[in-house]
Each structure stands twice: as C-alpha cells, then as structure tokens.
C-alpha cells in the first residue's frame, strides 16, 4: 500500500510538472546531429548536441524535447552528467503518427532569461508509413499515405522534418488538424522563433552493395561520400553513404532528404536526381523546365541558386516543394503539365523573399501567366480561380467564428493577414490573386520593374514592396495593400446596380454612352473589370469600388448593349451570383 501511494504521488507530481510546462520557453539555437539509417530494418538512430536558449521572461527549471512517437529517448546528458528526464506520450498532429515522444528534462539549476544550456541527446526507433493523423479524421488510408509518404525502407527512403516527421527535436504545444489552421499556425510560430537557428545533421546510410545517393534541400555535397561501417546485423564490414544537411535558419526551410540509387542530370532549367531507369522521363522534365525559361526571363532576375528536382521512387506519393527543391515522382505527362509543376521551384530559385505570401503568391501568379500564354486570359482566369472556392470557404469559416461578426474592424482584420498567416490557401491562393490584380491595375512593365528591383535583404518593413510599385508612379496603392495584405478584411461582393444607356446626340455612327453603377457589399475594395456586351462585341471598363460603396464607369460602344457583367474572375469575391445585369432592348422608333 505504501509503495502504491509513493508511485501515485510521483505520478501526480509528474502530471503537475507537465501541466505547468512552458513548451515554448526554449529556442534551439543550434543542432549538431549524427544520424544513422538502416533501410532494411527501417531504423534511425540519432546522437548529437542541442544548444537551448531561454527566450521566456522567467527562469526555467524544465526543458521539453519532442520527437516522433515512433522514436524513443535513450539518454540526455548535461556537462557529461546524465540529467533526470521523464518520458511522456504527447498527442499532436505536427507528426504523421499523430503523436510525439516527449522528454521533460529537469535541469540542475534554473536557466535565466537569455541563458543557454547544451544538452547531449540520444534517441532512435523506426520510421514506417503512417498517416494516423489523417485517417483518424476520416481520410481514406490510400489518399492519406499519398500525402504522409515519409518512411525508411529499402524500396523507398525519404523524410521531411517538422510537420511530417519530427526526426529532430522540437518543442510545441499540442495541436490538432481538426482545429482549423492550428497545426500550420503552430509550425509557423515555431519557424519564426527558429529563423536564426544553425542546423547541422550528418546522415549515414548503410548501402551494402547498392550505389546510393543522399540528396536533400540543404545537402552539402551533390550525392554524398562512400565509405564503410560495421553491419549492425552481422558485425562485418558493409558499405555506407554519408552526406550532410546544413542550414543557417529554419524559418522557411524544412530539413528534408531522400535516399536512392540516384544519378544526376544537369540542365539549364534545373538539376535532376533520378534513378537510372527513369532517364527518359528525367529528360522530359528537363525539357519542361527549359520551356519555362522565357517567362522566367521576362519577369525575374537570373537564378541565385540552382532549382533541383529529386525523384520520389514511390510513384504513388504527392509532390512536395520546399524552397528551390522539388521532391516528386517522375510520371509520364504532357510538357505543359510538367512545366506548371516545375515553375514554382524555378521561381523560388530566382526570387527568395522573407514574406511567404510574396514567394508563394508569385510562384502561382507566374503559373497563371504561363497558362495565359497558351490559353489567353480566359484560360488563365480559369486556372487562377481554382483557388476561389477554398478561398471563399476560408473567408466564410473565419466570419462564422465567435466574435468575428465585425470582420472589417481593425481588431479582427489584423488576424490571419497575408503577413502573418500560415494558411496555404491564403498564401498561395489569395497571394496569386493579389499579384494578378496588381498587374491589371499597374501593367506588366510596372510590376516587372518592382520585381527586378526587389531585394530580400532590404525588405524590412511590410510596405517595402508597395513602395517599389509606387516608385515613380502617381498612383496610391495604400488602400489596396491595406485591404488585401496588411489586413484581412475578407472579399468584395459586387453587383451591377444600374446601367444607363444614352445615344450621343448628333452622332451619325449611332454611338451610345453607357454608364454602369457598381455596388460593393463586401469588406474589401478592388478595381474590378466591367464588361459591356453588345451584338458586335464587348468593351471593358475598370471601376474602383471601395468596400460598402458604389462607383460608376462610363464607356462609348458602337451599339446598344445587351448585358453588363461585373468581374471576369480576376478579382476574388464572396458571391458572384448577381454579377450580371440584363439590359432590355430599346423599343423600335
């Protein structure tokens, strides 16, 4: 009975400690990891040192370290002395397993604010296909595994970091994918804290007789170095391939690597790592990358790094882009389709930015421009509008949240803006609409000039890009950036209130003047195209309509119009159901 009581008291103390933890108190300022991978047994074994800095305002007695729930902590040491730590299973969807293996470390003495501590760590386990976090939400298993494809195996070894597999230690509060954007927001907040973190990981993979290659988004050599090591199963010597990942900051780059019998194909548009049997497909991808060079040359400065494509040897996996590196299966497809797939990674190689909305939005915007070259404006807008439905849904969900009725007020509009969101729908979808609307308002030349003069190191305030666009122009864009970038005021909601048709007196050509009044019932303003349709063609007039206001546009047309349509799809709006205004035919004289 006494022993049971002692255990109960200890467990209660552990629970109280865990509940009182500040899991975001410490920032890992440096990772120095040595990673051993045995593909045959799916095993990863990691040793290394972490430098932790207390970024909270209070002294800290406890530090938390989390890795994937498929990995286990084996030891934690401070100054060559093992420290006390408690293992804890922690449910969180930042890992594909839907859980984390957490170590709650008791430090010998409090670490003051700004103080640092070096911990030597040892952990390991297996990494196998797991999509628990998706399937428990009802996602079909096959579809879930296409997205959560990370694993260690002889046929296929590839791993992404935080947000997929926590193969390096992190510390975040518990988050669930069922809670809106909570997972993305938590990861974004962690990345913000780790912007200056140094990351070094030396990766060793037992290769046996196979010719393997380790490549990733920050590997220091093209394919790795061959060597030998002891076989963990037989004790004899066995081949080993080694490569390193080095990053100066984890703010936007997620440490990712893949292992296969890769060969390298260097091309003007991109460098490809592919398996030997995929040489024909690799050449198709290289040709598709080259096909993008004209649009890239027209819109952007030369590349500051080489765009890289790494084959995922499992054909059922979904592509994954991180910066200027694309991990993707090589599949047979038409050149235009491949070009669209490759264009974002090529843009990333030419145009880095500290703002994700600029990076992601520009990548998709140039995809739209590429589609326009083949399919004109109508085809481009159809491609652009593929993000419209999820964007509208995201805005409706935000408006439905408790306390969000006054979305247009500053307190709510400052939430989830393009400057602070981690939502891919906003970053890539809304971001691409912003670039397209700016192009429609300013023209190609002005936007291209702003992109050419953009310097990521000089982008130190939110208005930097706006100022580049306004440079030498008489146009004020403050209202636009305030509605679409600095604030999240939602979307416009246009309708044609009236169209007034008047013949020009004494004009033998029978030209008529059309005045169209447009109302915007939404919370964001926009300059929107108004299409005036006549039996002999159509005329477009652009009208700037601020939120909850009306504005008019005028145009002369050669014949009485039959219909007026506000918005051709270039401006995302909450409801396009009443954008058309039918004009009754004038009675015969």
Task: Show the residue positions of the predicted features.
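Extended, low-hydrophobicity, Ser/Thr/Pro/Gly-biased non-transmembrane segments
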Residues: 120-252
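Juxtacatalytic substrate-recognition/specificity segment
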Residues: 201, 258-358, 362-366, 573
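A surface-exposed beta-strand-loop module
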Residues: 71-148, 187-191, 231, 549-558, ...
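Beta-strand-rich binding/interaction modules
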Residues: 75-77, 210-215, 223, 477, ...
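Acidic/His/Gly-enriched intrinsically disordered linker/tail segments
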Residues: 355-442
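Surface-exposed beta-strand/loop patches in extracellular or lumenal glycoproteins
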Residues: 51-71, 186-206, 522-531
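Amphipathic alpha-helical substructures
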Residues: 304, 423-508
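N-terminal, polar/Ser/Thr-rich
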Residues: 16-45, 74, 478-479, 483-484
């Amino acid at each position: 009975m006494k022993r049971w009581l002692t255990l109960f008291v200890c467990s209660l103390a552990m629970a109280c400690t865990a509940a009182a933890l500040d899991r975001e108190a410490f920032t890992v300022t440096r990772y120095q990891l040595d990673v051993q991978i045995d593909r045959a047994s799916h095993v990863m074994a990691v040793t290394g040192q972490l430098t932790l800095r207390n970024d909270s305002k209070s002294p800290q007695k406890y530090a938390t370290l989390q890795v994937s729930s498929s990995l286990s902590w084996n030891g934690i040491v401070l100054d060559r002395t093992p420290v006390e730590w408690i293992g804890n299973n922690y449910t969180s969807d930042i890992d594909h397993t839907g859980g984390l293996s957490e170590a709650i470390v008791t430090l010998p003495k409090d670490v003051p604010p700004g103080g640092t501590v070096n911990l030597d760590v040892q952990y390991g386990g297996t990494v196998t296909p797991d999509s628990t976090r998706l399937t428990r939400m009802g996602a079909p298993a096959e579809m879930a595994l296409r997205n959560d494809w990370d694993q260690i195996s002889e046929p296929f070894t590839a791993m992404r970091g935080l947000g997929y597999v926590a193969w390096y230690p992190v510390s975040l509060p518990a988050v669930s994918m069922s809670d809106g954007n909570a997972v993305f927001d938590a990861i974004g907040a962690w990345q913000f804290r780790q912007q200056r973190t140094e990351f070094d990981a030396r990766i060793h993979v037992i290769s046996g007789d196979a010719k393997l290659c380790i490549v990733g988004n920050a590997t220091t050599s093209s394919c790795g170095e061959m060597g030998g090591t002891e076989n963990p199963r037989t004790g004899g010597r066995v081949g080993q391939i080694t490569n390193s990942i080095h990053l100066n900051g984890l703010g936007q780059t997620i440490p990712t690597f893949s292992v296969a019998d890769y060969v390298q194909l260097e091309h003007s548009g991109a460098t490809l790592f592919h398996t030997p049997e995929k040489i024909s497909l690799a050449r198709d991808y290289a040709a598709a990358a080259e096909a993008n060079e004209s649009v890239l040359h027209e819109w952007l400065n030369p590349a500051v790094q080489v765009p890289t494509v790494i084959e995922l040897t499992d054909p059922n996996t979904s592509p994954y882009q991180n910066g200027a590196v694309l991990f993707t299966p090589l599949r047979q497809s038409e050149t235009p389709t491949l070009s669209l797939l490759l264009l974002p990674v090529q843009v990333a190689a030419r145009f880095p930015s500290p703002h994700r909305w600029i990076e992601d939005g520009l990548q998709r915007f140039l995809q739209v421009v590429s589609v326009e070259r083949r399919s004109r404006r109508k085809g481009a807008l159809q491609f652009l509008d593929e993000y419209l439905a999820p964007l509208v849904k995201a805005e409706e969900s935000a408006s439905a949240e408790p306390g969000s009725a006054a979305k247009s007020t500053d307190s709510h509009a400052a939430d989830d803006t393009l400057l602070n969101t981690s939502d891919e729908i906003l970053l890539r979808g809304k971001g691409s609409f912003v670039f397209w609307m700016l192009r429609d308002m300013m023209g190609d030349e002005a936007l291209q000039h702003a992109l050419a003069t953009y310097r990521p190191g000089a982008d130190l305030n939110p208005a930097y890009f706006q100022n580049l666009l306004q440079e030498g122009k008489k146009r004020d864009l403050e209202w636009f950036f305030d509605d679409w970038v600095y604030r999240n005021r939602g979307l416009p909601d246009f309708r044609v209130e009236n169209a007034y048709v008047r013949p020009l007196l004494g004009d033998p050509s029978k030209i008529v003047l059309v005045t169209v009044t447009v109302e915007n019932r939404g919370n964001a303003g926009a300059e929107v195209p108004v299409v005036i349709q006549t039996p002999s063609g159509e005329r477009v007039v652009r009208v700037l309509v601020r939120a909850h206001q009306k504005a008019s546009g005028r145009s002369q047309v050669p014949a009485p119009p039959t219909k007026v349509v506000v918005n051709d799809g270039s401006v995302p709006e909450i409801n396009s159901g009443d954008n058309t205004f039918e004009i009754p035919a004038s009675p015969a004289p």
